[in-house]
UniProtKB/Swiss-Prot annotation:
Record protein name field: Large ribosomal subunit protein bL33c
Family that this chain belongs to: Belongs to the bacterial ribosomal protein bL33 family.
Native species: Spinacia oleracea
Designated gene of the protein: rpl33
Matching SUPFAM superfamilies: Zn-binding ribosomal proteins (SSF57829)
GO cellular component: chloroplast; ribonucleoprotein complex; ribosome
Length: 66
């Protein structure tokens, strides 16, 4: 049986707070996490609350394109 595209794909989550601050040069860097998601169960963009070491708090990390 032929396998199609993989169901589980790696996604990169980026801090939305740091992205806004980096435009104004108020941040030292951008926090990124690498995780996996199941495309069949979660077809939309993934957003999780993760700890950002640059903001020093839990912020929303959104999925970005590779």
């Amino acid at each position: 049986m032929a396998k199609g595209k993989d169901v589980r794909v790696k996604v990169i989550l980026e801090c939305t707070g740091c992205v806004r601050k980096s435009v104004n040069k108020g941040s030292r860097g951008v926090s990124r996490y690498i995780t996996q998601k199941n495309r069949h169960n979660t077809p939309s963009r993934l957003e999780l609350r993760k700890f950002c070491p640059y903001c020093y708090k839990h912020t929303i990390h959104g999925e970005i394109k590779k």
